[in-house]
């Protein structure tokens, strides 16, 4: 995956919003810009994405082998148990005065960064990223159509499956398994609801 256009549009949004740096941790914005999905650990993973210069992915040492840069220009900065990841991120931010931080960043990390970077203004990253991500490239539209078509085929195939005598969880598991077998990389959830209040799971 080539992230060049996404980086360009993100930096345009940062420039328009007068944002010096973007800090992303868990959530969907990180893989959107890097292809890497952070595990929700008690150890900090954070992308420091400056307006100018190469981004840096600060990641626990044990997780570093999972990171694939795909030849893209971001620095992977592993940290060990004896190092301070907040200090590493703070140093990477340098002179940044206005920083957008990921909305899903754990509070303990957000507060720690605000404490050491008290001189900075902190804003939600969604102020930038929603506008960047809402505009789809032709390739992204094609991928969305392909994903939707796959799910449509799975739903059509489920019409011939026995539903009675099964739990909603069991049916949801079958939907998930069929979707993964059809080529999806992941499936976060499937809502299967029946009976009273079934339309409001």
Positions of PLM-derived features:
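Secondary-structure boundary elements
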Residues: 150-156, 164, 181-185
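Hydrophobic pocket-lining residues that define ligand/cofactor binding sites across diverse proteins
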Residues: 14, 162, 179
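A composition/biophysics-driven feature that prefers long, compositionally simple stretches
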Residues: 1-153
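Short catalytic-site patches enriched in acidic/histidine residues
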Residues: 30-40, 126-130, 135, 166-201
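Conserved short loop/turn motifs at secondary-structure junctions
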Residues: 102, 159-166
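Active-site pocket-lining segments that scaffold enzyme catalytic pockets across diverse folds
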Residues: 148-159, 168, 175-176
